[in-house]
Amino acid sequence: MEDAYARSVSEVLDFFGVDPTKGLSDSQVVHHSRLYGRNVLPEEKRTPFWKLVLKQFDDLLVKILIVAAIVSFVLALANGETGLTAFLEPFVILLILAANAAVGVITETNAEKALEELRAYQANIATVLRNGCFSILPATELVPGDIVEVTVGCKIPADLRMIEMSSNTFRVDQAILTGESCSVEKDVDCTLTTNAVYQDKKNILFSGTDVVAGRGRAVVIGVGSNTAMGSIHDSMLQTDDEATPLKKKLDEFGSFLAKVIAGICVLVWVVNIGHFSDPSHGGFFKGAIHYFKIAVALAVAAIPEGLPAVVTTCLALGTKKMARLNAIVRSLPSVETLGCTTVICSDKTGTLTTNMMSVSKICVVQSAEHGPMINEFTVSGTTYAPEGTVFDSNGMQLDLPAQSPCLHHLAMCSSLCNDSILQYNPDKDSYEKIGESTEVALRVLAEKVGLPGFDSMPSALNMLSKHERASYCNHYWENQFKKVYVLEFTRDRKMMSVLCSHKQMDVMFSKGAPESIIARCNKILCNGDGSVVPLTAAGRAELESRFYSFGDETLRCLALAFKTVPHGQQTISYDNENDLTFIGLVGMLDPPREEVRDAMLACMTAGIRVIVVTGDNKSTAESLCRKIGAFDNLVDFSGMSYTASEFERLPAVQQTLALRRMTLFSRVEPSHKRMLVEALQKQNEVVAMTGDGVNDAPALKKADIGIAMGSGTAVAKSASDMVLADDNFASIVAAVAEGRAIYNNTKQFIRYMISSNIGEVVCIFVAAVLGIPDTLAPVQLLWVNLVTDGLPATAIGFNKQDSDVMKAKPRKVGEAVVTGWLFFRYLVIGVYVGLATVAGFIWWFVYSDGGPKLTYSELMNFETCALRETTYPCSIFEDRHPSTVAMTVLVVVEMFNALNNLSENQSLLVITPRSNLWLVGSIILTMLLHVLILYVHPLAVLFSVTPLSWAEWTAVLYLSFPVIIIDELLKFLSRNTGMRFRFRLRKADLLPKDRRDK
C-alpha cells in the first residue's frame, strides 16, 4: 500500500480487512502471504562460476595472447619439436592468463557481500496480534495487515503504519535510512503532503529503524522488497560497476595496440614473401610457416604480458600506503580513480559531522540587580566522550565549573531529567548512547561540569577507568536524588518533568522547548551569587531573544528549570509545571568535525568540488556549510543550495545549470543520492560519494568511487571502494593526494613497459627486414617482458610524491596514458632499444673476437650458407652467443631506461637513483636473475643462452648506456617547451582523437 501515509487509520485497516483488536485470522495470513510474498529480501541470482571464469578472458589483449599461445603450440607440434623448451612459451602465456583470471574471479566473488549484509538490518522477531492473541513470531512470517506491537529498543520488522500510541510520545531513530541526525517523532495522523519523502511520512515506521522512545501499535503495510529497505536492495541490484578511468584508457590502449600488432605482423609476413622459397626453409609452405612464427614472436614481443600484473601490484602497494593514512582500499582500481575525482558528494551526518549531539553553548543569568545580565559559556568536545572543558564569555577556562550555581543546577537537571544511558564500549574503544541523542548530550554535559565541593575533581575524574568515567557524575546525582515520578514529554506541552526526593527536600526538574519552559517560570537562579529573584518582563524578553539567537545559529535549544515541592509528594501533574525557577539555556548541535574545514579548503585548492548531501532540513544544513567553509564565505548562496523537491521541480535545462553550482543538496532520500551521482556523471564528472548509512549504499556503489566511514554500517562498507578507518573527512584529502601520486607513477611504469616493448618490436621487425637470423627466441622475449621488465616497473611505483601534487587541477578522464609528445619520446627510446639489440646481435657475428667475423652480406644471406662454399660452418648461425648478447643488451638497456623513469621531466642529476632505492634494488635483483640464467647450465639450456665473456659484457655496456644520454636530451626539450622544434602531437595523438578529447 504505497499511500498508507495519506490514508486514515480506518482506511488502512479496511484495505487489509483487519480488526485492530483481533488481528488477522489464520486464513487471512495464508491469503496475504500468497498475495504479497514473504518478509525477506530476495537473494540475487549468483553468476555461475564458469561464467565468472570466462568473463576474465573477455579482453582483446588476452584473446591475442591466447591465439599466440595456441599458434605457438600448433607450430611446435607441426615441426615435430619435443622437449620442455618447445612448449615453454605457450605454457608460460597460459599460466599468466590463468593467474590473472583467478584474481578476477576472487575479486568478483567478494563483491556481493553488500546485499547479504543488508539483511542484517531486518529484525529477527516481532510481537504480533493474530486471532485475538499476541505472540512472538519470526519477523520473516509477517504479512501486510498484521498488527504489531512496537516499543522502545525494538527494531522495526517491516514497513508499518502507526494506528495507536500507548505513550505520550513515540520516537524513532531512522538515521540509517534518511541520514537525519536526530530521532524523529511519529504519530497516527495522516500526512497530506504531496510527493512526500521519507522524512515527511510521520506515521510510517520503516523497516530496520529503531524505536528510541514510546510504545504503540502499527499495521504492516509492506514486506520484503516492498519496503524502504527493499527499494535500496533493488537499487543495488540494478547498479553496474563502472570501469575506472585507468581501466578505460588501458582498454583503449589495448584495442589500439592490438590493431597495430596485427598490422605489423601482417606487414612482416608480407615483406618476407620473397624469402618463403629460400632453400634453407625446405619449400614455400615451410618458409611461410617460418615467417608466420616470426610474426607470432612479434606479437609476443609487442604485448606487455606483465602489464596487468604490474598494474595490480603497483595499485596493491598503493593501498598499503593509503592504509597508513587510514584509508582502507577495498577495490584496487579505485586507487587511481581518486586522482581524477572532480566532485565529492559528502553525506553530512556522521561524515562532515560527528553524528554525536553535543552541548556547545550555555546561557545563564549572571545577575538581575539592574536588569538581567546574561552570561554565556561555551563547551568544548564534539563526541559522546565525557571529555571537554567549559569556557566563560572571555574565553577563559573554568577550572571548577560545578562551583558556579547555575552550572551546578544545570548538571543536576541534565542528569536527573533524563532517560538515556551513556556507556563505554571496550570493543570499539568509544562511548555509545542508548536513547535520545539530545538527552545523551545533556548527560555528557553533566560529566563535563563535574561535581561541586571537590577541588581535585578534574584530576580525580581523569584517574577513573573509561567504563567508570562514562557516567560517574550522573551516577552521583542519581544516588543523591531518588526519582519518584516522571511526566513524559508531550507535543502540546513540549517539556518533560521528573519529581526527585533528596533527604528532607523534594525537587521537580523540568526541561523542554525554551518558549514552554520560560512561559512557566516566574523566578530566575542567578549565577553570580546563587540567589533566586523574580523573572521580570524585561528578563523574559532578554531570554527569548537569546534562544532565538541560538536558533539563528541552528543550535537545538533546550531550557532547564526546577521547582521545590512539598516533601513526601508522590506524584506530580501538569498543574505542577508552573512557578518554575529558570536555570539556563543549552544550545546543542551535531558538530562538524574539527578537521573538516581545512579538508574542504584543500579540496578547493585541488580543484575538487564538494557537494554536501543530507536528509536534514535546509536551514540546518546551510548553517553547517557556513561553518565548514563549503560556501566559500559567501553571504548570498542562492543557486548553491537546493532541497530534493526544489531540484526536481526545476526544468531539465535549469537542473543542468544547478548541478554546476550546487554545494548543498538537502531533504534527500536514497534515490535522490543515486540520481545526483548519475546526473553528475552525465556531465563527465568523476564522482566520489561518501557516507556511512544503509541509505548511502546505492549511491556508494553507483559512484566512480564510494567512500564509507569506518564506523558506518556493514552495508555501506561493502558497497564502497574505500573505507575511512578514522571516519575523518580530512583523510580523503590525503588519499586523493596519494591517488594522484600513484597514478603518476602508474603512468611512468606503463610508459616504461611500452618503450621496452617498442624496442622488442623494432628488434624483431628490423631483423626480419634485414633478413638476418632470429635475434631473440620467443621464450627470451617472455623472460624479458615478465621478469626483467616487471620488477623495475613495479619499483617505479615507489617514486616519491611531487610536492605540488594537490595544487594541480584533477586530470581529465579522457587524458591519454601516453600523449603525443610523450609517445614520440618513448618511440625514440624504443627505437634505440631495438636498434641496440640488433646491433649487439650483428656485432658478435661481424666484429667480436669470439665470433666468425662475417661480412654484412654473408650474415644477411645466411639462408644460402649450405649452397655456397664458406670458410665457416653453417652451424655458426645456430650459435647461442649472438642471441645471448642481444638479449643481454635488451635487458641492460632497459635497466638504464628504468632509471630514466624516476621522473617524467627532471634530470637524473636532479632526481637521483637515491630517491627510489626500491628501483635500485629491483635493477640489482633483475641483473642477478639474468646472470643466473646465463651461468646456471639447466637454465641456460631452457632459455637458449650461454655465458658471456668480459669483452662481450663490455660491448653490452657500450651499446646500452647511450639510452641515458638520449632521454636526458628529450627531458631537456620537455622542460624547455619552446625548443621542441614546434613538434606538436597533443592535438593529434596517435590514439584516436575522439577517445582522447572526450
UniProtKB/Swiss-Prot annotation:
SMART domains: Cation_ATPase_N (SM00831). Residues 70-89, 271-291, 767-776, 841-883, 936-950 are lumenal. The chain crosses the membrane at residues 49-69, 90-109, 251-270, 292-309, 747-766, 777-797, 818-840, 884-903, 917-935, 951-971. It is found in: Golgi apparatus membrane; Endosome membrane; Prevacuolar compartment membrane. One of its GO terms (biological process) is root development. The active site is at D347 (4-aspartylphosphate intermediate). Mg(2+) binds at D692, D696. Its main location: Golgi. Induction: Not induced by manganese or zinc. Residues 1-48, 110-250, 310-746, 798-817, 904-916, 972-998 are cytoplasmic. GO terms for molecular function: ABC-type manganese transporter activity; ATP binding; ATP hydrolysis activity; metal ion binding; P-type calcium transporter activity. Ca(2+) 2 binds at V300, A301, I303, E305, N785, D789. It catalyses: Ca(2+)(in) + ATP + H2O = Ca(2+)(out) + ADP + phosphate + H(+). Keywords: ATP-binding, Calcium, Calcium transport, Endosome, Golgi apparatus, Ion transport, Magnesium, Membrane, Metal-binding, Nucleotide-binding, Translocase, Transmembrane, Transmembrane helix, Transport. It is a multi-pass membrane protein. Gene3D superfamilies: Calcium-transporting ATPase, cytoplasmic domain N (3.40.1110.10), Calcium-transporting ATPase, cytoplasmic transduction domain A (2.70.150.10), Calcium-transporting ATPase, transmembrane domain (1.20.1110.10), HAD superfamily/HAD-like (3.40.50.1000). This magnesium-dependent enzyme catalyzes the hydrolysis of ATP coupled with the translocation of calcium from the cytosol to an endomembrane compartment. Involved in calcium-enhanced root growth, in tolerance to toxic levels of manganese and in secretory processes. Has a crucial role in manganese nutrition, but is not involved in transporting copper, iron or zinc. NCBIfam families: ATPase-IIA1_Ca (TIGR01116), ATPase_P-type (TIGR01494). This is Calcium-transporting ATPase 3, endoplasmic reticulum-type. The gene is ECA3.
